[in-house]
Each structure stands twice: as C-alpha cells, then as structure tokens.
C-alpha cells in the first residue's frame, strides 16, 4: 500500500474496511441505500408514481377498448373478416352499411349478416340493438360505449336507422364493392376505438421513454456521487465486474421495490373506481411492470458507464 506517502484523507479512506471488496455480494450498494435514506425514498417514490401512472393508463386503455369494440370483437373473432361497404374514404360501421345485394353475397360465402341499430329504452338510456342469430354471449358487451341488446334480426330491422355488416371466414373470396377487415383493422371500424387507443397507447409509450430517462438521470447523479468510493474499491483490488454487479443490483433493488408498490397501488385503487371503465388484470399490470423494469435497468446501465471507465487516482484526488 501507499500509507507512507499518501495524503491523510486517502489513507483514511483506504483504512475504511467497509469499502473493501471482500465484504460480500452488494455490500457497498446496500450500505449506500441504507445510508442515503432520503435519496433512496425519493427514487423509490418516483418509480412508484411512474409505475402507477403506466399501469393505470394500461388498465384504462383496456377498459375503454372493451367498451368501444367488445361486441365487434365477439362477432368477428380472431380468424374472420369484417365486411363493410366500400363507400370511399374512412371505412366505419356508421358509413359502411351493406346493400341488399352485398348482404346476399355474404350469405352465399357462408357468412353472417349482422343487423344493428341505435335506440333508447323506456328510461331514455341509449343502447345498440344487434342481431344475435340465436347465439348470445354470456357477458354484457359494448360497442362505442353503449351496451348491446341482443335481438332477432326482424326486431332490429323494425328500429329506425338500422344498418348491416358482414362476417366471413378469413379464406373467403373478396366481395365486389366491399372492404374486408381483420384484427385491429376490424376493431378500428368502431368510431371511438381508434382515437382512444392511439392516443392512450402513445401516452403509455412516452411514459416508458420518460421513465427510462428519469431513472437514468437519477442513477447517473447517484453514480457520480459514489465515484470516489468506487475508485477506492478498484484501488484495493475490486474487479470491474463486481462493481458492475453491485451497481446493477442496487438499481434492481430500488426498481423492484418501487414497481411492486406501484403495481399494488394500482390494483388497490382499481377496485374503488367503479364508475371508470378500467380493466385491472395481469395483462395490464404485470406486462407494464416488466417493461418498466427493463427500461429502468437500461437507464441504470447507461449511468454505470462512467464508473467502468473511472481512473482510481483521479477520482480519489477529485
């Protein structure tokens, strides 16, 4: 060692056994988390709030999707085509009603012609009447945020403003004068689905990007503040891989605690928001949580680059 000529402050740091690389896995990282309780609480709270925002938006997006197009998704399914009249411009259920000739073509392709109409019940509540052809779903479905009342085709046709669309198998031949839509394109025929989902999904993606930047900034500041301790660890023989493991492990602990708390908060809050169309499920909580964990680790990983390039002598003298 250099105890005979090193400056006193460096000798004191080198004599501090808590900084040696032989104290166990993530010793220094855990010690810093405990020693900086204020900073630890701040970044965990930040992760918690970001997680809550993302999971709440994901749950809201899924809930709005169900109220916008669940009936259409039920009718079309995953391996069938939605058939609408090609009226030019943007195709939707309101503008793409089939003609009688096109409806007969759909039936000739072993397809189903669905009749629908907007109406109101005796209490003045709006609903959409839709022909069920004797096959009603077990749960209440919606279209464009209005509940579906299943009726026979004859009953729906008696209502004013009725329109029709077709459903055929995915291998059916094209029908002249129509457009055939599948998957997300079919759901976009709902007037409310496309606008809601595109805006909400954009917000969620932006939150993922923002979370990576915010967490990266937090960990960058945190990392720069611990450069001297890292330099001493390197000077005492600590390997760069152990330093990397320690830093990533530290970030992982913070992220897991914050993301878990944010996810649990969303699950708890979602149970009380009965008037808001939210679908709190594993798909809307665990998947966003996993993406946030990866985004946070990416931001933390980028912040560790200066640590891996640190010169022990320069860092200790700074």
Language-model segments: what does each one mean?
Residues 43-53, 197-217, 254-258, 262, ...:
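Alpha-helical transmembrane segments of integral membrane proteins
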Residues 176-213, 220-228, 233, 248, ...:
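Peri-transmembrane interface segments
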Residues 1-41, 303-318:
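Feature of multi-pass inner-membrane transport and sensor proteins
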Residues 80-83, 136-192:
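A short beta-strand structural signal in non-transmembrane regions
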Residues 70-128:
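Membrane-proximal extracellular/periplasmic loop immediately following the first transmembrane helix
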Residues 39-41, 52-80:
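Alpha-helical transmembrane segments
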Residues 252-297, 301-318:
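Short helix-loop junctions at transmembrane helix boundaries
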């Amino acid at each position: 060692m250099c105890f005979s000529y090193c400056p006193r402050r460096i000798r004191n740091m080198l004599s501090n056994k808590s900084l040696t690389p032989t104290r166990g896995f993530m010793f220094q990282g855990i010690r810093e988390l405990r020693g900086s309780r204020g900073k630890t609480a701040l970044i965990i709270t930040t992760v918690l709030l970001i997680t809550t925002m993302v999971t709440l938006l994901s749950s809201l997006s899924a809930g709005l999707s169900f109220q916008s197009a669940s009936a259409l998704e039920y009718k079309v399914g995953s391996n069938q085509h939605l058939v609408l009249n090609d009226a030019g411009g943007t195709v939707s259920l309101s503008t793409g009603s089939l003609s009688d000739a096109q409806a007969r073509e759909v039936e000739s392709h072993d397809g189903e012609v669905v009749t629908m109409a907007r109406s109101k019940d005796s209490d003045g509540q709006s609903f959409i009447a839709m022909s069920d052809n004797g096959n009603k779903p077990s749960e209440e479905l919606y279209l464009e945020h209005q509940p579906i009342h299943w009726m026979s085709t004859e009953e729906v046709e008696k209502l004013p403003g009725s329109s029709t669309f077709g459903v055929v198998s995915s291998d059916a031949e094209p029908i002249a004068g129509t457009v055939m839509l599948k998957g997300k394109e079919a759901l976009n025929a709902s007037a409310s689905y496309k606008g809601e989902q595109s805006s909400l999904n954009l917000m969620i993606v932006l939150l993922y990007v923002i979370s990576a930047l915010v967490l990266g900034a937090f960990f960058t500041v945190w990392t720069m503040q611990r450069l001297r301790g890292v330099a001493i660890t390197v000077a005492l023989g600590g390997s760069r891989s152990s330093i990397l493991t320690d830093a990533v492990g530290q970030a992982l602990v913070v992220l897991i605690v914050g993301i878990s708390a944010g996810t649990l908060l969303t699950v708890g809050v979602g149970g009380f928001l009965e008037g808001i169309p939210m679908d709190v499920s594993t798909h809307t909580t665990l998947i966003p949580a996993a993406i946030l964990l990866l985004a946070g680790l990416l931001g933390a990983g980028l912040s560790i680059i200066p640590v891996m390039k640190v010169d022990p002598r320069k860092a200790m003298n700074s």
